[in-house]
């Protein structure tokens, strides 16, 4: 029995929440114990760009990218749980990072 931590990131929170819901459903179907989804603070990266190619520094445009994150901890992961997670078809926009947290 092993602890697994899933960290999911996406630019669109709706796509992220759908992926989290499908992961939680798959884990609960196998009977594993889980904690989460835990929402992490949204990271906002802002960029300021001068509009014109030459002078006129007063004319600027601002852009931002928001990265939404969630953590799911699977406390008691069985081989069946890992197999069901591998078979899941998640959205391509969602970045999934899997870490093994050790043995119990």
From Swiss-Prot:
Keywords: Ribonucleoprotein, Ribosomal protein
InterPro entries associated with the record: Ribosomal_uS10, Ribosomal_uS10_CS, Ribosomal_uS10_dom, Ribosomal_uS10_dom_sf
Protein name (record): Small ribosomal subunit protein uS10
Sample GO molecular function, one term: tRNA binding
Similarity section: Belongs to the universal ribosomal protein uS10 family.
Function: Involved in the binding of tRNA to the ribosomes.
Keyword check for Ribosomal protein: yes
Oligomer and partners: Part of the 30S ribosomal subunit.
Pfam entry (one): Ribosomal_S10
GO CC terms, sorted: ribonucleoprotein complex; ribosome
GO BP term, pick one: translation
Coiled-coil ranges (or none): none
